């Protein structure tokens, strides 16, 4: 306030403004404790009330932009703590508190205890990410640690029945608030872990005040979660509520329902995956069957009938016979040609007729003997080849007591697997054909 003449009068509004400025500058934001009195919610959404104790009271105002963050509605006589600035309502000259935040009395101590325990457990490594265990994607059984009277239990069971009705659920009943609740929760977690009935445990309860949720901020519960042999999912309170149990748990869900959704596989999704996998398997089997059928067709084209083999062998014998006859003719022609050459040479040289005649006679005999020997050797070779071919002929095989079986389409049958009881096959014997009805089929175990 600027300096003035002490005898000069100042307006009331200017005085009140100066006082308000001094108060706001002289008193920073301060926590004040007292009881609610004369609480009023204006149509604008602002709160007006008085804060009092046994010695005094002071008016308070909390504007809507601030009070919408308070998680409870103050009641007459309720003990609260407010964070406020001291100011003056200039229009009336009333001293008041401009409230920025509000909490129930005593919550400040609880919050400080919460922070101290959180720091202690963090230093002990209970919040370390490497300690967290993965939640099984398809649990065989699910455990729930909560109160039987909790609305959260009904929400969790409803969600599990909807998403995974095939998964059995075990409920471990325990009080979730009140004296001794924390130790009972810890004991039940130890029991559920020791029994190993479940693949995952849900620790849950519905929303409430910080006092209602305090059992989940106790050190005993934190250590029980940490030493559990079974993964623990916390679903405590609402999404904005955080407890020590949330930090220690392997996974924190925003709500009990969220915890149930997190641990349960969606049955519809699993059925869809199964159907798609089945369709893929059917397609794969069809492709494999088509491939094998194509391979069988290729093999069938390569298999020749006994008649075709017989015709091929006959053609080979005929070819060998032609070659043999040709070789004999060529030998005779060569010898005759040599004889003619000798005769020409004899005529040209006019040798001694008697000696020449003797030579000719001798050579003629040798030539005849050589031709005879050559003919005999070729004849013997032809006989051996013909005998070998005769042994290989299918007709000889049939004459030794064997038979060729053909199906109704004329295909040769090679395996008992191609026969069916009651079917009729055509048996080719050495000197005839017979139709045979198959009475039964038996695989060869060894030997004939």
UniProtKB/Swiss-Prot annotation:
GO function term, MF aspect, one: exodeoxyribonuclease VII activity
Main function: Bidirectionally degrades single-stranded DNA into large acid-insoluble oligonucleotides, which are then degraded further into small acid-soluble oligonucleotides.
Any one GO CC term of the record: exodeoxyribonuclease VII complex
Catalytic activity: Exonucleolytic cleavage in either 5'- to 3'- or 3'- to 5'-direction to yield nucleoside 5'-phosphates
Keyword check for Hydrolase: yes
EC class name: hydrolase
Keywords associated with the record: Cytoplasm, Exonuclease, Hydrolase, Nuclease
Keyword S-adenosyl-L-methionine included in the entry's annotation: no
Subunit comment: Heterooligomer composed of large and small subunits.
E.C. number: 3.1.11.6
GO biological process, alphabetically ordered: DNA catabolic process
Domain of life: Bacteria
Location in or out of the cell: Cytoplasm
InterPro entries linked to this entry: Exonuc_VII_L, Exonuc_VII_lsu_C, OB-fold_nuc-bd_dom
Similarity field: Belongs to the XseA family.
Descriptive protein name: Exodeoxyribonuclease 7 large subunit
């Amino acid at each position: 306030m600027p300096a003035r003449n002490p005898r000069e009068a100042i307006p009331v509004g200017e005085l009140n403004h100066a006082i308000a400025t001094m108060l706001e500058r002289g008193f920073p934001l301060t926590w004040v404790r007292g009881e609610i009195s004369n609480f009023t919610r204006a149509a604008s959404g602002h709160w007006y009330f008085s804060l009092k104790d046994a010695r005094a009271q002071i008016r308070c105002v909390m504007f809507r932009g601030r009070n919408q963050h308070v998680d409870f509605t103050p009641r007459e006589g309720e003990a609260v703590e407010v964070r406020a600035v001291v100011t003056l309502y200039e229009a009336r000259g009333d001293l008041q508190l401009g409230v920025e935040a509000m909490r129930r009395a005593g919550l400040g101590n609880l919050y400080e205890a919460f922070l101290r325990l959180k720091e202690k457990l963090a230093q002990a490594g209970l919040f370390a990410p490497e300690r967290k265990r993965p939640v099984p994607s398809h649990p065989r059984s699910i455990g729930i640690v909560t109160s039987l009277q909790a609305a959260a239990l009904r929400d969790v069971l409803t969600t599990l029945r909807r998403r995974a009705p095939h998964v059995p659920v075990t409920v471990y009943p325990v009080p979730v608030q009140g004296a001794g609740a924390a130790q009972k929760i810890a004991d039940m977690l130890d029991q559920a872990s020791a029994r190993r009935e479940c693949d995952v445990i849900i620790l849950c309860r519905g929303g409430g005040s910080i006092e209602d949720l305090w059992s989940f901020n106790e050190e005993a519960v934190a250590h029980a979660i940490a030493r559990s042999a079974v993964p623990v999912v916390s679903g405590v309170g609402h999404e904005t509520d955080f407890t020590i149990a949330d930090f220690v748990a392997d996974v924190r869900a925003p709500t009990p329902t969220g915890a149930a959704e997190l641990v349960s596989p969606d049955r519809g999704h699993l059925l869809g995956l199964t159907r798609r996998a089945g369709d893929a398997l059917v397609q794969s089997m069809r492709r494999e069957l088509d491939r094998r059928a194509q391979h069988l067709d290729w093999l069938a084209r390569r298999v020749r009938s006994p008649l075709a083999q017989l015709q091929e062998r006959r053609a080979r014998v005929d070819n060998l016979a032609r070659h043999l006859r040709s070789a004999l003719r060529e030998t005779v022609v060569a010898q005759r040609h040599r004889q003619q050459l000798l005769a020409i040479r004899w005529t040209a040289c006019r040798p001694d007729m008697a000696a020449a005649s003797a030579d000719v006679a001798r050579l003629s005999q040798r030539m005849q003997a050589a031709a005879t020997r050559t003919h005999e050797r070729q004849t013997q070779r032809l006989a051996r080849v013909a005998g070998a071919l005769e042994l290989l002929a299918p007709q000889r095989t049939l004459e030794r007591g064997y038979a060729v079986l053909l199906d109704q389409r004329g295909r040769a049958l090679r395996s008992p697997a191609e026969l069916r009881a009651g079917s009729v096959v055509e048996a080719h014997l050495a000197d005839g054909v017979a139709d045979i009805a198959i009475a039964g089929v038996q695989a060869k175990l060894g030997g004939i």
